[in-house]
């Protein structure tokens, strides 16, 4: 069992039940999935860039990546409907917990000039989204084999009903929010 999953069961559930006075253990918010998204707009000119992005995400997630395609044509961006312009992967279960552990303990501390995560990046329903400017903060990415530094979006979806519950859930995992 993943370390943070055990922490959730042993400590976080009790802490949140006490803090929000839940009557049932099933009311306690939990993380349901983590979505990683990498937009590669430059893939229009060079298809190899998308392949490198897919390889990076596969190394991070340990599972197959879905290539996202443009939904409609935009002349200003020189894209047509159906052009591959990014990739994403959704993590659930054990892989999600393993990635979350690496994100909190390894990747976030390696961010350059890090002053804490924005506590206002919740969507109103307890889900948290954050952007990472460099994929090289993850230990799975070999720095010497990186062709270009790319960023990615990381969305943590929870069962929390409010932002306050979601913030308390992530803070219980020692998520480094700005004060």
Curated annotation (Swiss-Prot):
The keyword Ribosomal protein applies. GO terms for molecular function: rRNA binding; structural constituent of ribosome; tRNA binding. Coiled coil: none annotated. Pfam families: Ribosomal_L5, Ribosomal_L5_C. Keywords: Ribonucleoprotein, Ribosomal protein, RNA-binding, rRNA-binding, tRNA-binding. It comes from Marinomonas sp. (strain MWYL1). One of its GO terms (biological process) is translation. GO terms for cellular component: ribonucleoprotein complex; ribosome. Belongs to the universal ribosomal protein uL5 family. InterPro entries: Ribosomal_uL5, Ribosomal_uL5_bac-type, Ribosomal_uL5_C, Ribosomal_uL5_CS, Ribosomal_uL5_dom_sf, Ribosomal_uL5_N. Part of the 50S ribosomal subunit; part of the 5S rRNA/L5/L18/L25 subcomplex. Contacts the 5S rRNA and the P site tRNA. Forms a bridge to the 30S subunit in the 70S ribosome. PROSITE patterns: RIBOSOMAL_L5. This is Large ribosomal subunit protein uL5. PANTHER family: 60S RIBOSOMAL PROTEIN L11-RELATED (PTHR11994). The keyword rRNA-binding applies. This is one of the proteins that bind and probably mediate the attachment of the 5S RNA into the large ribosomal subunit, where it forms part of the central protuberance. In the 70S ribosome it contacts protein S13 of the 30S subunit (bridge B1b), connecting the 2 subunits; this bridge is implicated in subunit movement. Contacts the P site tRNA; the 5S rRNA and some of its associated proteins might help stabilize positioning of ribosome-bound tRNAs.
